[in-house]
Amino acid sequence: RQMCIRDRFITTASAQENRIKVACIGNSITYGYGLPDRTTQSYPAQLQKMLGESYQVENFGKSGTTLLNKGHRPYMQQDEYRRAIDFGGDIVVIHLGINDTDPRDWPDYRDFFVKDYIELIDSFRAANSKVRIMIARLTPIADRHPRFLSGTRDWHGEIQLAIENVARYTGVQLIDFHEPLYPYPFILTDAVHPDPEGAFIMAQTVYSAITGDYGGLKMSLLYTDNMVLQRDVPLTVQGIANAGDRVTVSTVSYTHLTLP
């Protein structure tokens, strides 16, 4: 009996050691500020439930932090950053930039944003040479935010473009927290922080990016069987499918397969 218990303990410990480690890097939105129970409702906590026991998801969010190293609270100067580096995640998900819209930060230091983001990415690559890094387009800021028209709206847009440039320069995976939340400003309880439903949407976005499971083929209702196409006019047909799925598009004269 003792041997069985010992073997079971060793097997359990081995399974824990072999789990894929996911580090969630960010500010108060990642931390779960404003949620009734951040330990179960933050997006990293909900992501853990979605991914299951073969993954270990850790929340390294720090409220008020900036991506900018000259910002009012740089993420790379926080204990959470040092713990994330020590964690050595196999997957690192970064959502930073919301607090950089502060008038203390973006107007004076915007030219450092791309450089500082690349430095952050490089530090995680140094901690784990095989790390898979995802950086996120920013969650929305609702128009009821007190600084929305005095600069925040425009700076938020500029930061989105900078994040897209970082993804291109570094070759990391770009994910989008903005598009799925934008139609629902009411779930941004204080114009910035998502409620539990919003955190679920963020977790679902990361889950799909990690696993390639997007819930099967999804296309706009604009595209239907037997639809009429205008001749001699280019038509872009787009949608979402699970990673690796091949989709067939057929017209009267042609049949095309998407690339795997």
Model-derived segments and spans:
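Catalytic His-Asp segment of secreted/periplasmic serine-dependent ester chemistry enzymes
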Residues: 35, 138-215
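Boundary at the C-terminal end of the N-terminal hydrophobic targeting segment
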Residues: 13-15
